[in-house]
Structure formats: C-alpha cells, structure tokens
Amino acid sequence: MALRSATADTSERRGDRPGDGDAPPPRHGTTRPGAWFAALLLLTVSTVLACRIADTDAVTPIPQLLAFLPWLLAPTALALLFAALSHWRIGLVWGVAALAVIAWYIEPYGKTMEPGGVPVAEIRVLTANVEFGQATDGLIEAVSTQRPDLVFVQECEATCEKKLEQAFCRNGRNGRNGKGGKADKDGGYPYRQAVQSVTAKGSDGSVILSRHPLKPAKGIPATMGMPGATADVDGQEIRLQLAHPMPPLPSHLGTWRKELAALRDYAAANIGRPTVVAGDFNATQDHAAFRRILDTGFMDGARLTGDTRTPSWPALTAPAFGAQIDHVLVSRGFTATRTRFLELGDTDHRALVVDLTLRKST
C-alpha cells in the first residue's frame, strides 16, 4: 500500500493524468494559420514569376500583375515574415528563392549598343497621355518649358487638339497634312500628324507635333489612334510612330496582344532606318509582348540613361509606386543622354522627355 501511495503521489506531482499520452503534439509548419497565409502569398508570387520565366503573358490576372513585378518584393517579404513566425522552414527557403528570382528580373532588359560615328542630329522627344484631354493645359506648359522637337500626344480629343493648335501653330503654317517647309526655331509646332477622335471621351485621338517638316506616313491601324510620319531633322529623315495600344483589361487582352504585335512588326521593318516609336505602350519590360518589340533591336531611351524602373503610371502614386508603361524607343544609330519624367496634373500618366542624338558613320 505504501509503495502504491508513493507512486500515486509521484504521478500527481508530475502532473500525469489518464490519457496524457494521447495528447496531440504541438503544431508546426503549415498547420499554423500564419504558414497558410505565407503559402498563399508565395503561391501567387510564384505563379507570376513562372510566367515571367516562361516568357508568356498568360491570362488574367497575370498581365496585370506582371506590370508591377518589382513590387512583388513586398508580398514576398511579408510571406517570409509569417513563415519565420510560424517556424516554417520550407516557406523560408521558398521565400528566399522567390526574392532571388524577382531581383534577377528587376535588372534592365534590352540592348544598350553605343553607336559610333559623328552626331548628325540632336532631338528632344516628349510623350504624354493627357487622359481624355484633361491635362492639355499642363502639357502646353511642359512643352513651353522643355521645348522638345517632337511631341507625341495620346488621348487628345477635339478640345485638346484645338488648344494645341492655338498654342503652337504659328506663322500661319499648319502641317496637319505634312506639307513641306522649314524647322520652326521660335517655339512653334507648325507641323502635325493626327488621328482625330471619333468617341465622346476622346481616348482614340492622337497627335504628333513637330518643329521640323513632316511628311505623312502610314500609321498602325488600332483601336486608339496610332499615326505615323517622317520628319526632316537637319537633313536627316527620321520615321516617327506614335504608340497607344489597348490596355490589358481582362476583356481586351486579345486586342492588347494584337496591337503590340503590330508595333513589333513595325519595329522589325524599320530597324535599319532612323526611327522613333513613342507613346503609352500599356506594357512594361516584364510583359513578353513588349520584350518582343525590344528583341527586334529597338532600344528604350529610359534604359539607355539608367531609368528603366522609374514609374510613369499611375501618376497619383509615382514615383513611390507604379510601372513604366510610357516609352521612347529608338532604332540603331541613336544614343540617349538624358531622361525626365514630368508631373502634368489632371492625368494618370507622367510625361516622358528623352534627349536623343542620331549618329552616322563617316
């Protein structure tokens, strides 16, 4: 009896109770809510990265998320935090691997060839999406300050076009039809090529303004206006093409791909001559459809000046957060010396100004 009593007392002191041996072990890894949340974040990030690696834009929501690929660092870091708090080792390894892949693809894409030869033309290009014409006044001020040689304007409806004509079409010369003349050195833009808006909002209206004489050239048929022209800049013929494909909305992905493919075909056909393609591409270097344009040999002006990741949209959060979907692309023979992103107000885009030099071998 004494032995049994001692054993019972010892058992009670240890806290043993009937059935204690059947208690479940402490939960670890993905059995914890934090680990499940980390796994969900990492799965989303990994799906986007897999499409980037596979060189495809896939289907919604991948194209929309690819536009913000650098910002996937934030959910990945959050996933790592939850994985660490949950002691989920696989999640930690997974998160670190995802960070490494994102860091790899943040690097600039595309060529940066430095052409030889002597400078034959200096060109300042400004491109701006004025959002249904709302930012026309801001654009006029920016043009007056920056004094670009060429201006590419997207979403320029009838009122926008009229204001631009009143502000910059001087000396009675209207170059709407691209007829000859001389370069305007006094701040005017007498030469223009336009696709007039036929919709109420005016998103399909586009205008190319030039100090230098323009000749009409075949544009690219698209939902929104994409006019073309040929400029005579100091005796050098330079092809101009305004870019404004449809945005990658879920209901318009097919059109977005088709119109970017048309820009790619244009680039491939004109890589051997001095050419500038500028505008709102509704795509970043992380979209396969845009990279195929760069693969023709065209170079991004912002890439040439080290500003690849500077956001141009949405203006409300840029430069702290956003994506660079506005571009100035150039063919062989061009160098870029400076890039600026300007706040216009009343538009969801920042204007882009790039200083270019055309060189030719002697």
Which residues does each PLM region occupy?
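N-terminal, active-site-proximal structural segment of metallo-dependent hydrolase catalytic domains
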Residues: 2-167, 173-183, 360
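Soluble catalytic domains of enzymes that build or remodel membrane lipids, polysaccharides, and related
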Residues: 125, 131-144, 153-172, 179-362
